[in-house]
């Protein structure tokens, strides 16, 4: 039996979410339509509101409802440090960790030749204008420790070093509360290589 076109359209729309395949999308669609119509309506309204009201912060490129996001508008933040992250979710993780009190720039991606994403797709003109505003003295690169994140980090470090800025990279290592026995070998090796004096 073939699904009605409206149901097929909903299933197809749900498949655009990361990690959602055809079966999961179908289960989600049936759940929303059968058991949670209020939830489905709430989801539709929230998505519509986000699509119409969210834009990109003029300075850091993260999502914002205003010209400047709350972080860029906060005058108490350090203006001499600029942390570069791949995605808005990365910025939020750093903020939740309360480990950085400078400003950010969100690339909205990373260099990934397999996905046809190159440097031109990472808002580098906007990033350069931000980094070279005369206030920033240190660039903190906080891209992910994947092959794509490493390539992006290398490209960014070269870009800023040749412009005379100090460039640092977040360290890799043992998770807090992690036990050596359960940590993967790459993480353990990196933690040993990047050890610090005590």
From Swiss-Prot:
Keyword DNA-binding part of the UniProt annotation: no
Biological process (GO), any one: DNA repair
A Pfam family recorded for this sequence: Toprim_4
CDD domains: TOPRIM_recR
Keyword check for Transmembrane helix: no
Domain Toprim: 80-175
Zinc finger residue extent: C4-type: 57-72
Alphabetical keyword list: DNA damage, DNA recombination, DNA repair, Metal-binding, Zinc, Zinc-finger
Positions of disulphide bridges: none
Entry's Gene Ontology molecular function annotations: DNA binding; zinc ion binding
Record-linked SUPFAM superfamilies: Recombination protein RecR
Domain of life according to the entry: Bacteria
UniProt-listed InterPro entries: DNA_Rcmb_RecR, Rcmb_RecR, Rcmb_RecR_Znf, TOPRIM_dom, TOPRIM_RecR
PROSITE patterns to which the protein is assigned, alphabetical: TOPRIM (PS50880)
Alphabetized NCBIfam families for the sequence: recR (TIGR00615)
Function, in words: May play a role in DNA repair. It seems to be involved in an RecBC-independent recombinational process of DNA repair. It may act with RecF and RecO.
Family to which this protein belongs: Belongs to the RecR family.
Protein name: Recombination protein RecR
Organism: Chromobacterium violaceum (strain ATCC 12472 / DSM 30191 / JCM 1249 / CCUG 213 / NBRC 12614 / NCIMB 9131 / NCTC 9757 / MK)
Gene expressing this chain: recR
